[in-house]
UniProtKB/Swiss-Prot annotation:
<keyword id="KW-0812">Transmembrane</keyword>
<dbReference type="GO" id="GO:0016776">
    <property type="term" value="F:phosphotransferase activity, phosphate group as acceptor"/>
</dbReference>
<dbReference type="InterPro" id="IPR000917">
    <property type="entry name" value="Sulfatase_N"/>
</dbReference>
<keyword id="KW-0808">Transferase</keyword>
<dbReference type="InterPro" id="IPR017850">
    <property type="entry name" value="Alkaline_phosphatase_core_sf"/>
</dbReference>
<keyword id="KW-1133">Transmembrane helix</keyword>
<feature type="transmembrane region" description="Helical">
    <location>
        <begin position="17"/>
        <end position="37"/>
    </location>
</feature>
<keyword id="KW-0444">Lipid biosynthesis</keyword>
<dbReference type="Pfam" id="PF00884">
    <property type="entry name" value="Sulfatase"/>
</dbReference>
<dbReference type="GO" id="GO:0005886">
    <property type="term" value="C:plasma membrane"/>
</dbReference>
<dbReference type="InterPro" id="IPR047787">
    <property type="entry name" value="EptC/CptA"/>
</dbReference>
<comment type="pathway">
    <text>Bacterial outer membrane biogenesis; LPS core biosynthesis.</text>
</comment>
<feature type="transmembrane region" description="Helical">
    <location>
        <begin position="119"/>
        <end position="139"/>
    </location>
</feature>
<dbReference type="GO" id="GO:0009244">
    <property type="term" value="P:lipopolysaccharide core region biosynthetic process"/>
</dbReference>
<comment type="similarity">
    <text>Belongs to the phosphoethanolamine transferase family. EptC/CptA subfamily.</text>
</comment>
<comment type="subunit">
    <text>Forms a complex with an unidentified protein of approximately 36 kDa.</text>
</comment>
<keyword id="KW-0448">Lipopolysaccharide biosynthesis</keyword>
């Protein structure tokens, strides 16, 4: 008599799938959850970490009996990458990004040693031990996830197609985007998930570095300005240029806004005769890169490409013998910000204070105050210091500490018809302006305390529409649908007593002149006492020969897209000259 045993087919288990998901999600989503709960960023990081961590289920589905081995091998890689990212966040309060790689590769050996030594603090060791213990515990709970054939292949392909192949096919073949741009977009989505933050970060870093190197080489090949003269003498001096972000003057009490959003600058304006407030300066482009390609060079709306063929303001100051510094709280190395990094690398020394993965992450401009003080103490006889702020960049609530929301819930002086979400944004923007006021005033005060021979100029790169213009439904910036608030900017000049003594000038008759930020390099040259072939005193807002011209706005690369700023409606609103 023969007995036969029929081996039962293993069954699919939701519990086993749940543990597998939890295991792979743990390595990426924990950090993203901490970032979100801390209020430093939104939910996109959590979403993308959950989605792209799920790719590791594919080998688990295909080879269920080997789940422990597969999970261990993959887990070691995920553990190392995610632990490094977690420790970086604990130490620096920032998410790992390609900007971090840029700064790391630009760092000298001593600085790198200081950086690495921080990882071996007791706090980091305890975090690493706890993190490892949880990872091992989750690994011990793993069980095979059996999906019957051929469904395991279908499910695995569906995961791969939905997360990788479909976005590539849609963007490349349907939307006709360049394949390189498609990969960049996919890499950005994958970045929150371990170990992709390192792989995509390095890929993006290399892409931007190649572009950066090319632009810098082209800039270095430019001939110097001809017939160059510095008429300011040989005395030691320090000149400061502070670049703000997304700050429109119509929301500053300094310019008549009824809410007290700039109390420190208001006080300085009342007590310090050397602070001049210009009332009628507008930007030409409502986007950071595009306007700085004009404001920091000889380019303008009619000649937008001159930034490629003529020296920049930074080149000019180095030609005049200045040691140049760039302190920035903007992102360092991204596809969008490559030109900013090019400008910064045209200076002698850079301080990159913001390594966040996204611009819409919580970061405060007080970051710049310490390096600013350090540079003020630099012994160089002639110094140019450029400080680039995040200002009031969206998301506005991430530009100031959570406990400093002075205008939260305030309905005074609010446009009619705003819903709760719009009111929150409106008040957040005023809170951001209040914090920006503190930073800008602190820079002026710190500069003044150094007893310098020089001057400081502050302007915002562009404005921001935050439900200001009727019918009060627009927020942000749109060059194709412009409002005055997108272009109206603060423009301040502070001169030291020493500078005023040797360069006596009265700017009181200049403050209401109509001026475009695109012509800044001529005003800066005038203030600094520089002349050369191409300098035009009629384009300097502080020169007696100044001539008002049409203030063009719009995209100069589009046919018939330029319009006269002064033809825009609602010029009677506060700050809308």
């Amino acid at each position: 008599m023969h007995s036969t045993e029929v081996q039962a087919k293993p069954l699919f288990s939701w519990k086993a799938l749940g543990w597998a998901l939890l295991y792979f999600w743990f390595f990426s989503t924990l950090l993203q959850a901490i970032i979100y709960i801390s209020g430093y960023s939104g939910t996109n990081g959590i979403r993308d970490s959950l989605l792209f961590s799920s790719l590791w289920l594919i080998p688990v589905f295909l080879f269920p009996k080997r789940i422990k081995i597969i999970a261990a091998v993959i887990g070691v890689v995920l553990w190392a990458a995610s632990l490094a990212a977690l420790c970086y966040y604990v130490i620096y309060g920032q998410e790992f990004s390609q900007s971090v790689l840029f700064v790391m590769f630009e760092t000298n050996t001593n600085e790198a040693s200081e950086y690495l030594s921080q990882y071996f603090s007791l706090k980091i060791v305890l975090i690493a031990l706890a993190y490892t213990a949880v990872a091992v515990l989750l690994w011990t709970r793993l069980r095979p996830v059996y999906i019957p054939k051929p469904w395991r292949y279908v499910v695995s392909f569906a995961l791969l197609y939905g997360l990788i192949l479909h976005p590539i096919a849609m963007n490349t073949f349907i939307k006709n985007k360049p394949f390189e741009k498609t990969l960049d977009n996919l890499a950005s989505r994958m970045e929150p998930a371990a170990p992709w933050q390192f792989l995509t970060g390095y890929y993006q870093y290399r892409q931007q570095l190649n572009s950066l190197t090319k632009l810098l080489n082209e800039n270095n090949a430019l001939p110097p300005l001809a017939n160059f003269k510095d008429e300011s003498g040989n005395e030691p001096r320090t000149l400061v240029l502070v670049i703000g972000e997304s700050t429109q003057r119509g929301r500053m009490s300094l310019y008549g806004y009824p809410r007290e959003t700039t109390p420190e600058l208001d006080a300085l304006h009342k007590t310090d005769p050397n602070l001049t407030v210009f009332n009628n300066v507008v930007t030409s482009r409502p986007y950071t890169i595009e306007i700085l390609q004009q404001a920091l060079t000889f380019a303008n709306e009619k000649n937008p490409d001159l930034y490629l063929t003529q020296p920049s303001l930074m080149n000019m100051m180095k030609q005049a013998g200045y040691k140049t510094f760039w302190i920035t709280n903007q992102q360092t190395m991204t596809a969008r910000n490559t030109m900013l990094t090019v400008f910064s690398r045209q200076t002698d020394k850079q301080y990159y204070m913001n390594q966040q993965r996204t611009q819409s992450a919580r970061e405060y401009d007080t970051n710049v105050l310490k390096p600013f003080q350090e540079v003020l103490n630099d012994p160089a006889p002639k110094k140019l210091i450029i400080v680039h702020l995040l200002g009031t960049h969206i998301k506005y609530k991430y530009r100031y500490p959570e406990n400093q929301g002075k205008f939260d819930g305030n309905t005074d002086h609010v446009p009619p018809g705003l819903n709760a979400e719009e009111l929150e944004s409106y008040n957040d923007y005023d809170n951001a302006n209040l914090y920006n006021d503190h930073v800008v005033a602190s820079l002026i005060k710190d500069f003044k305390a150094a007893n310098p021979n020089g001057f400081l100029v502050y302007f915002s790169d562009h404005g921001e529409e935050v439900y200001d213009t009727p019918p009060h439904k627009t927020q942000g910036r749109n060059e194709d649908n412009p409002t005055r608030h997108m272009y109206t900017i603060p423009f301040l000049l502070w001169t030291s007593e020493k500078w005023q003594a040797t360069h006596p000038r009265d700017f009181s008759q200049d403050v209401d002149r109509k001026y475009s930020l695109a012509e800044l390099i001529h005003t800066w040259s005038d203030l600094a006492g520089l002349s050369y072939d191409g300098y035009d005193p009629t384009r300097s807002v502080v020169n007696p020969q100044f001539k008002e011209t049409t203030r063009w706005i719009g995209n100069p690369y589009k046919k018939n897209a330029l319009i006269d700023y002064d033809t825009l409606p609602y010029g009677d609103q506060v700050g809308n000259q």
